[in-house]
Amino acid sequence: MSAIAPGMILFAYLCGSISSAILVCRIAGLPDPRQSGSGNPGATNVLRIGGKGAAVAVLIFDVLKGMLPVWGAYALGVTPFWLGLIAIAACLGHIWPVFFGFKGGKGVATAFGAIAPIGWDLTGVMAGTWLLTVLLSGYSSLGAIVSALIAPFYVWWFKPQFTFPVSMLSCLILLRHHDNIQRLWRRQETKIWTKLKKKREKDPQ
């Protein structure tokens, strides 16, 4: 089945290139997320500029565009190595989307969706790690960084044959968050609660 893997890689990249943040903001009449807030077309920035409803829509779509190509390849019996490349292709499409001038998000939700087909137990643990980190720290970016660091160890425990591809995916996410890591180190990163507070003050209901 690895013969179809190159085509699946291209398909995954094209799926990832559909920027839900930009499309949702256009449909909802919101500012372009690439030019507003943090400038990152992802769910967290859409939460800042558009509120919870728009952010949830972006989050769900971003998860699905990582999940569906990998799930399809997994069902067809593609080997773990190629599955890893397909997952990375979906994230690369999200980060550098061919349909939107190669300016995309950071790939966290798409990576989470790409890992989900490995197993719901792993998915639950990963989601719990992100949520717990965000609740304790208030930093969405720190939740993504911690989850990316721990993901290979979780996978090694649940399904060790996928450790290498998930490690590659984690490296991509960490590289994409290098600016956030620097801001966290300098204590200049904005907490997600602050973003929500500013949104309420700007648009009181």
UniProtKB/Swiss-Prot annotation:
InterPro entries: G3P_acylTferase_PlsY (IPR003811). It is found in: Cell inner membrane. Pathway: Lipid metabolism; phospholipid metabolism. Its main location: membrane. It is a multi-pass membrane protein. One of its GO terms (biological process) is phospholipid biosynthetic process. Keywords: Cell inner membrane, Cell membrane, Lipid biosynthesis, Lipid metabolism, Membrane, Phospholipid biosynthesis, Phospholipid metabolism, Transferase, Transmembrane, Transmembrane helix. Coiled coil: none annotated. Its EC number is 2.3.1.275. GO terms for molecular function: acyl-phosphate glycerol-3-phosphate acyltransferase activity. It is an enzyme of class 2 (transferase). The keyword Iron does not apply. It holds the Pfam family G3P_acyltransf. The chain crosses the membrane at residues 4-24, 56-76, 81-101, 112-132, 138-158. Belongs to the PlsY family. Probably interacts with PlsX. Catalyzes the transfer of an acyl group from acyl-phosphate (acyl-PO(4)) to glycerol-3-phosphate (G3P) to form lysophosphatidic acid (LPA). This enzyme utilizes acyl-phosphate as fatty acyl donor, but not acyl-CoA or acyl-ACP. This is Glycerol-3-phosphate acyltransferase. The gene is plsY.
